[in-house]
Design a protein with these regions (language model features):
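A general alpha-helix detector
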Residues: 48-53, 85-89, 127-131, 163, ...
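A short hydrophobic/aromatic micro-motif that marks alpha-helical segments and, especially, helix-coil
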Residues: 38, 74, 111, 154-155
Length: 201
């Protein structure tokens, strides 16, 4: 399997044109919410993965609040920064004991070289997911969020994402299925997903 491409400004333009032409509802979302910003993300793999762990099973507002608190106590929001902070301080910032443990394990593996997140830029989507789900606290959803927001992969559709499922029902009817709708969005499912999430904001 070859490496998937990345979301670039050109890919965003192509994606928006394709989605607008292939799906009337998606065309409306693109007009309403404007250009997708996924191409503008800085490559910060550890930070992206740590934030994905923080966000698990939380509303966007709650996750943002905890993320800001953690950033305030972790120097640089880096692996070394996390490893220098007592677990009790992470708990006081709002992390559950499990999430604190997961992020510290991630930080340790990155620090000692057992996990090379930078090398994942060259790996196929399936290989990235397979490597990440071996880590404690990282499942399919977290790995898929890393593909979108950490590696800027253009064609990721997280079938288990409750927000995407809800948006599809709201926009396409109660009987609409995310997996079925996603077939018409390929190869730009990541961009389509961004617009669906914005619809819920």
């Amino acid at each position: 399997m070859s490496r998937a491409g990345q979301i670039t400004p050109t890919v965003v333009i192509e994606a928006e044109a394709y989605l607008s032409q292939s799906c009337r509802v998606m065309a409306g979302l693109i007009r309403t919410h404007g250009p997708c910003p996924l191409a503008d993300r800085e490559f910060r793999p550890f930070q992206t993965l740590a934030n994905s762990i923080i966000s698990q099973q939380l509303s966007a507002k709650a996750a943002d609040t905890i993320e800001r608190r953690v950033q305030a106590i972790v120097p640089g929001f880096t692996p070394a920064g996390f490893l220098a902070v007592p677990t009790e301080a992470l708990r006081a910032a709002g992390l559950s004991s499990a999430k604190a443990r997961y992020i510290l394990e991630l930080a340790q593996r990155v620090s000692d070289g057992r996990l090379n997140l930078e090398a994942m830029q060259e790996a196929p989507d399936a290989d990235v997911i397979a490597a990440l789900v071996e880590l404690p606290g990282i499942g399919q959803w977290t790995a898929e969020m890393f593909l979108i927001f950490g590696l800027s992969r253009p064609d990721v559709l997280s079938l288990g994402d409750a927000g995407l499922q809800r948006a599809v029902r709201l926009l396409f009817g109660d009987d609409a299925k995310l997996e079925h709708m996603g077939q018409s969005w390929r190869p730009f499912c990541s961009v389509a997903s961004w617009y669906l999430w914005r619809h819920l904001d």
